[in-house]
């Protein structure tokens, strides 16, 4: 029962996180394409001037990709994008963390001496993941731009390429990101609740069905100190 309850709670967190990440990606795409259409981030940095440097290098795929990435890096402030995504995911982390902590108390009766909180360390780990998410977005856009440049597309066609292809890619990523972020934060909340509740050990217990991996089945029943990996 406890396992089913936790799985239901996790799925609820994943759905909410996926909606949040999808909204961020949609807003980010609008900002990127608007900047592409205006041609510049500010008066001194012309996006299409940088792109055009790649359009004369159609024989060199590496040079085209480098030119596309250089132009993209100058298009918008990616540090601000990191900060925006961090603000977006903070409530996701908090909610999933608290859900994980509550599930341990409700299902196992483990009461913490004091309420666990999402620590600065966990937020810093989250910031690393945020930067990785935006780096992947940059890579995907740069790759799409490079393909368009190789195909001899106009600037308008390049913008259209991004508008048409990026949403599908980002939707798939949003699902994976939501699963990862919700699971990581729920596990962190559960672990913190057990620590604050005075637990000193943890025991690996499998679901006991045919879906259990051999490597996990061999760990069934193994007990280790709570702060050590299995």
Q: Which stretches of residues belong to each language-model region?
A:
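N-terminal leader/targeting and assembly helices and adjacent pre-domain segments
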Residues: 1-169
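Acidic, glycine-rich two-metal-ion catalytic cores of nucleic acid-processing enzymes
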Residues: 169-230
């Amino acid at each position: 029962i406890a396992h089913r309850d936790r799985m239901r709670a996790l799925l609820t967190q994943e759905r909410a996180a996926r909606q949040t990440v999808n909204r961020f990606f949609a807003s980010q795409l609008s900002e990127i394409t608007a900047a592409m259409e205006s041609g510049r981030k500010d008066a001194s940095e012309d996006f299409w001037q940088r792109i055009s440097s790649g359009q004369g290098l159609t024989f060199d795929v590496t040079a085209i990709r480098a030119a596309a990435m250089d132009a993209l890096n100058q298009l918008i402030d990616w540090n601000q994008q990191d900060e925006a995504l961090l603000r977006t995911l903070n409530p996701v982390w908090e909610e999933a963390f608290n859900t994980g902590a509550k599930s341990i108390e409700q299902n196992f009766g483990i009461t913490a001496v004091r309420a666990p909180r999402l620590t600065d360390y966990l937020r810093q780990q989250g910031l690393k993941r945020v930067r990785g998410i935006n780096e992947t977005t940059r890579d995907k856009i740069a790759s799409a731009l490079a393909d368009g440049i190789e195909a001899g597309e106009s600037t308008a066609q390049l913008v259209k390429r991004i508008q048409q292809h990026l949403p599908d890619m980002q939707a798939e990523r949003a699902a994976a990101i939501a699963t990862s972020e919700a699971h990581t934060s729920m596990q962190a909340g559960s672990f913190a609740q057990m620590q604050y509740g005075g637990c000193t050990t943890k025991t690996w217990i499998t679901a006991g069905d045919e879906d259990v991996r051999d490597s996990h089945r061999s760990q069934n029943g193994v007990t280790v100190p709570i702060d050590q990996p299995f």
